[in-house]
């Protein structure tokens, strides 16, 4: 998935938490893009079966939520480490992590997400934090 498509998927998901129904114009306004740009991106996400359009409303599919969760697991992990260990601002760390995650192959992305989840589960089971206390990446659920 391109970083642009991921931004649209994130926007649709975030708007769904705020609004009763999400429309194409809501996404366009949220991302400060034209309706045509939003339409094209939404169509690409629909073709990949990440979203559905029901009565002009945009809804994430189960597949869309699953893929988004995988991407966000990696993005949160990477951005936390970039901020903490590299002195990168939070906003820049998030952008860099999002772009890097989108550059991964599907196989690599899946492997990294599974690794992070297993590390988080290990930290939860031991009552600690991921990769030792100096990492600062606390388990979020």
What are these language model-derived features?
Residues 1-10:
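Short alpha-helical segments that sit at the start of domains
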Residues 27, 38-48:
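Basic amphipathic alpha-helical segments that dock to polyanions
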Residues 56-74:
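Basic, amphipathic "hinge/linker" alpha-helix immediately C-terminal to the N-terminal HTH DNA-binding motif
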